[in-house]
């Protein structure tokens, strides 16, 4: 008897239970444009609260680290800014005792332009906001050709001086040369790039076949730090930074 009442209760609960299905009756949406017009109506209390943080950020981002002749922008298949960043990868390699044959920097990792004139550390962070670190990999010539095919399929990435690719408008590789020479399939090529790409991301899966992979130890190996150091060195030498579009990647048909 003592088990009967709980059992009856369970039966009644099951009998009363109904399964409901839910369907979307309507959808409403609107687009909210977030731009600087909100800055005109920031409450005074919020301004006062944020002021000390803003001063701290400004103290870090406002120092001038470099100088450019004009605005450097990103564009495919080749651009001044992507050329510069790929060249900086090669330059940095020599600072770490490496002798890279070429450098690669992805267009997707370039998030802003470098302004004309004075360049601040904040400008560099805008260009390279991620914690990507410089790395060095060895690829065979055959794997390097695969890498160039993948770059062509993506419409172009940043490649260093000496690389000459001819591609079609629909992303096929026609020819590839390095320092005026054809790529030797059995040769070994040292590539400087960020660790994100060296892991085979952004469709550059040829990097998965890399050997002798190295990320330098210690602080200051992030891309933005290396870019900053290059800009500082050029500024100290009195050289405003520029980088021409010189046919590193050409669409020929």
Residue ranges and their predicted role:
Residues 1-4:
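Positively charged n-region of N-terminal signal peptides that target proteins for export
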Residues 31-33, 37-113:
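Hard-cation-handling environments
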Residues 18-35, 84-86, 90-92, 98-103, ...:
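Feature captures C-terminal
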Residues 12-15:
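C-terminal motif of bacterial Sec signal peptides marking the signal peptidase cleavage site
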């Amino acid at each position: 008897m003592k088990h009967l009442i709980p059992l009856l209760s369970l039966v009644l609960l099951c009998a009363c239970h109904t399964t409901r299905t839910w369907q979307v009756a309507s959808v409403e949406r609107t687009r909210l444009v977030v731009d600087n017009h909100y800055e005109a109506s920031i409450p005074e209390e919020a301004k006062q609260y944020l002021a000390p943080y803003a001063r701290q950020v400004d103290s870090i981002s406002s120092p001038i680290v470099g100088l450019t002749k004009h605005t450097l922008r990103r564009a495919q298949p080749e651009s001044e800014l992507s050329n510069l960043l790929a060249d900086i990868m090669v330059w940095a390699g020599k600072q770490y005792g490496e002798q890279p044959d070429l450098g690669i920097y992805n267009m997707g990792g370039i998030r802003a332009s470098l302004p004309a004139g004075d360049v601040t550390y904040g400008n560099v962070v805008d260009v390279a906001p991620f914690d990507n670190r410089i790395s060095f990999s060895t690829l065979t010539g055959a794997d390097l050709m695969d890498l160039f095919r993948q770059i062509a399929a993506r419409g172009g990435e940043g490649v260093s001086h000496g690389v000459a690719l001819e591609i079609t408008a629909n992303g096929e590789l026609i020819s590839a040369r390095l320092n005026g020479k054809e790529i030797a399939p059995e040769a070994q090529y040292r590539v400087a790039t960020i660790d994100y790409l060296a892991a085979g991301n952004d469709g550059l899966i040829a990097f998965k076949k890399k050997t002798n992979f190295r990320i330098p130890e210690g602080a200051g190996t992030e891309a933005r730090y290396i870019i900053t150091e290059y800009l500082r060195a050029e500024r100290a030498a009195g050289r405003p930074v520029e980088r021409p579009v010189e046919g590193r990647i050409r669409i020929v048909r």
